[in-house]
């Protein structure tokens, strides 16, 4: 026991005699030099002691020196010089540089080593003391701080920047914060790739998004961050950096909820980041932001944009009718492979179809066909069908009709012919429609209808011939079916003939007309100028027995029936129809609600009208001006039992405006 205790006491007393405790007392082993320091002791672990390496010795000695600095900082003359009690004391450039370097060393050691004096952000007296000195220096001499900051080494700059940012934020030094961020970004831009890798850790900090930076600094942050990832494309981007990019690219005034993004501890590749940013730009209609991101990618020499980002960019330009920039992009050879995507095709066709400029559409398709695509016949048919649909959606019916006849005959197909018939129906070319359907569609349609007038029309001189389509080779699609029913109603314009045709189709086992076409025939009978009430009621009764076939068909029939009874003031049958409609009230629009209200108000059933109006408010239908004018006809006394239905402030404003 004495052999163990006496050497231990001797080492402890020798350690206490040292004025500066640069080396803490070793545990379980007394050594005479650092080279004899072992990591594992034989008596404790049962293993042979391993000699410490040179790196471990360097870390040990450096950590010990920082511990001595921490333990004696209050007695140091440098810190004594700038105590709060010493009025008028100002730090020099060398003093400030010394503090910064010492803080960065202690900060670095604390992240890798367990030191005796813990470097705690809230409890460490040294850090509290230094933060006070930094805040005092920011207040009294901010120019000196910025000068010293610009002279720091890269590693020291990376360590001291978050500390200075936190101190400046806590003391509300907004101007100093902005200038500090500017100096950091300028320093980052002037560094090489190795130095940028050291400084880049500060790009991930959340304090960027908590500082009110001007727009030029936000743009500079985005530019430098993207350029760094352009040159280091193998590195992914973490969620905090993507969140900062989102905040700086898009204004908070647009109602963004800047929630923190989470990628499940994954690094997001740059192409996915760009697709994410372009999708936000498309959603918020931010053309300038998308153009800025596109320029950054082009300047970095990264080649073509990622496909998803490019598609969103072209769709955004199409939405804003920026045809000039779209034309410049399509001429770049690097995007040729993207132009086969149907979303790109529809985006390019949208601004042209809105103007009805079918000649430009033809020239664009011709350029793609000969220089870009080399496409197959099936794909060309899809492109032309897209073009026809775009013209029809924008109600450019004459352009769509003319566009069809400019298509090469070998490209025409059933879909294109059907779209041409839709345009012809809107232009009231009903004789052409009947001839084309009778000639180029299979099934002897006109003979099966059994109307002599229709047969005579189709046997007359043909108004046109569709080259590229064989007679009798097409099948009647649902769209063509409705076009045929509409043309028959316009051409015959006879309620008796239409009623005979409707009865014939309803009694036929294999009816030519579908449900929607039957509704068109019914409306044709109801709207004929020389029709009688008996004929119309007979037509309504014919379809009333078939309404259980389909819910949508039932709603359409009851809607036509309701309109018919209200127009003829047959309120008894109107009430019966309304009872049937009340079971399906979630499935019809505001027009039917308005007819229901008209019928009730005309019968002075105001209490029922108020109940219907309450159901209208709870439904998905949107009230219009007709609804508001009908409600004003109801006496206000009937709204007492429904206080929530009284005219709100918005309704009063609308009524006063009307």
Swiss-Prot record:
Q: Where in the cell is it found?
A: Mitochondrion
Superkingdom of the organism of origin: Eukaryota
Q: Where this protein primarily resides, as one coarse class?
A: mitochondrion
Please state what is observed when this gene is inactivated.
Answer: Impairs growth on galactose, leads to low viability on glucose containing G418, and leads to strongly sensitivity to antimycin A on glucose medium.
This entry carries the following GO cellular component terms, namely: mitochondrial matrix; mitochondrion
What keywords are assigned to this protein? Mitochondrion, Repeat, Transit peptide
Determine if Transcription regulation is one of this entry's keywords. no
Transit peptide endpoints, chain numbering: 1-29
What biological-process terms (Gene Ontology) are attached? mitochondrial gene expression; mitochondrial mRNA processing
Q: Where are the PPR repeats?
A: 130-164, 220-254
This chain's function reads:
Mitochondrial RNA-binding protein required for the stability of the atp6 mRNA.
The entry's protein name is Pentatricopeptide repeat-containing protein 7, mitochondrial
Organism classification, top ranks?
Eukaryota, Fungi, Dikarya, Ascomycota, Taphrinomycotina
User: Which gene is annotated as encoding this protein in its UniProt record?
Assistant: ppr7
